[in-house]
Amino acid sequence: MEELLIALAKGLVEDKDSVKVTVDEPAEDGTIVYHLNVAPGDMGRVIGKQGRIAKAIRTVMRASASMRSEKVMVEID
């Protein structure tokens, strides 16, 4: 899952070396939180107009997680 998020983000940003993902321990309800960190200059590319790109990233991650019977949440920092 972490590799999928990194691949999605690196496809959008200019500074590919700045893409970092940290993972929190699963919460009580089993939700795994992924924190996506990108360079400040690339933040707009990852979020997109009205958050459309961010929403698409979250949708792809949720779909992939549901195939594994997992719950995920993506936060963009």
Segments and roles (model prediction):
Residues 1-45, 55-77:
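RNA-contacting regions in translation and RNA-metabolism proteins
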Residues 47-51:
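Glycine-centered tight-turn and secondary-structure capping sites
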